[in-house]
UniProtKB/Swiss-Prot annotation:
This is UDP-N-acetylglucosamine--N-acetylmuramyl-(pentapeptide) pyrophosphoryl-undecaprenol N-acetylglucosamine transferase. Its EC number is 2.4.1.227. Pathway: Cell wall biogenesis; peptidoglycan biosynthesis. GO terms for molecular function: glycosyltransferase activity; UDP-N-acetyl-D-glucosamine:N-acetylmuramoyl-L-alanyl-D-glutamyl-meso-2,6-diaminopimelyl-D-alanyl-D-alanine-diphosphoundecaprenol 4-beta-N-acetylglucosaminlytransferase activity; undecaprenyldiphospho-muramoylpentapeptide beta-N-acetylglucosaminyltransferase activity. The gene is murG.
Length: 366
């Protein structure tokens, strides 16, 4: 099987694509997979480390640009269509997946024009511009939330969930305890702000420590700060003698998840998919500038099921965050109910479901 996975730009688009590739290789070890993205997208840094082949196209973003920038974007679209056609002619894929982001658009369109089966993945409640357009021509659409079906043709839309890395389900607690200096018997709080950290979350958590002093001997914290905030966040924990492992970046996220009892995080599609696949209680703080406000929508979906607590970014401060933490940790039944609701919401085998759809399309083509 020869497969192109197109799109990326951000982790929310890219990581489900990598997870899908992992599922494909698991079922078809001989599969040949190439990713197509842009030199400025996250894929340029991440894909080379995975061992997959990566090709670039010249497409530029369109949404939120000035008139002159939109003119440049349209010009880049024409060039990227030519580049996409060349990639497809050279590689001759059996199927093309679009994982979202503007880089997916010309590749999926070029595949459609060549009558190659295409599947687009929509990880959020409201599709972005690329997927709204591609949904009209794609062979199939894989969605994460039932509400999203209103944006696509029901006949070819499937509720699959967002693919996650299988490693997420296989965390090694014993390894994690050594890695993060975990003390048995304490409640572990994992704090994430995305791969670059999030200053607003860092500030709220450190300001909230004074409100969490009564819990100091019951909790321990793993905090990913981002490079810029590492030193001062580390010092805040040390000054108040909280048991905390503070890191600029967590490379062993699988192990961090395995020992976490409560996760404080943004609400990107990949993060939500991972948290629910492993049934973690969480406090979600949606990134307020995400396209179409999709992070808040993701978080509200979980909130409606009792799977998380929600704090809007504009309302976030130390006292508010500490109140949410106290509410959950002082009533063990609340955390247990959140864990069960989270697990019920999760779809850990989304990748396999999407592969089944691909197999069906390929059988029909024959």
């Amino acid at each position: 099987m020869r497969v192109i996975i197109a799109g990326g730009g951000t982790g929310g688009h890219l990581f489900p694509g990598i997870a899908l590739a992992e599922s494909l290789i698991g079922k078809y070890p001989e599969a040949q997979i190439i990713f197509v993205g842009t030199p400025k997208g996250l894929e340029a840094k991440v894909i080379p480390k995975t061992g997959y082949e990566l090709s670039f196209i010249s497409i530029q973003g369109f949404v939120g640009k000035s008139f002159s920038e939109k003119a440049k974007s349209l010009k880049s679209l024409l060039k990227s269509m030519f580049e996409s056609k060349n990639i497809i002619n050279s590689f001759a894929p059996d199927i093309v997946f679009g994982v979202g982001g503007y880089a997916s658009f010309p590749v999926v369109l070029a595949a459609f024009l060549k009558k190659i089966p295409t599947i687009i993945l929509e990880q959020n409640t409201v599709p972005g511009l690329a997927n709204k357009l591609l949904g009209k021509i794609a062979s199939a659409v894989a969605i994460t939330y039932p509400e999203t079906i209103e944006y696509f043709s029901r006949e070819k839309t499937y509720l699959t969930g967002t693919p996650i890395r299988k490693k997420i389900l296989e965390g090694n607690k014993e390894k994690a305890k050594k890695l993060f200096d975990i003390e048995e018997g304490r409640i572990t709080i994992l704090i994430l702000g995305g791969s670059l950290g999030a200053r607003k979350i860092n500030k709220a958590m450190t300001e909230g420590l004074s409100y969490l002093l009564p819990l100091k001997n019951r909790i321990q914290i793993i905090h990913q700060t981002g490079e810029a905030d590492y030193n001062w966040v580390y010092n805040e924990y040390r000054n108040l003698s909280f048991r905390a492992t503070v890191l600029p970046f967590i490379y062993d996220m699988v192990e961090a998840y395995s020992v976490a009892d409560l996760v404080i995080s943004r609400a990107g599609a990949s993060t939500v998919a991972e948290l629910t696949a492993i049934g973690k209680a969480s406090i979600l703080i949606p990134y307020p500038y995400a396209a179409y406000n999709h992070q808040e929508m993701n978080a509200r979906r979980l909130l409606s099921r009792g799977a998380c607590e929600l704090i809007l970014d504009r309302e976030l401060n130390g006292e508010v965050l500490a109140k949410k933490i106290n509410k959950i940790l002082n009533k063990p039944e609340i955390m247990k109910e959140m864990e069960m609701a989270s697990l019920a919401f999760g779809k850990p085998y989304a990748g396999e479901k999407i592969i089944e759809i691909a197999e069906s399309l390929l059988r029909r083509k024959r």
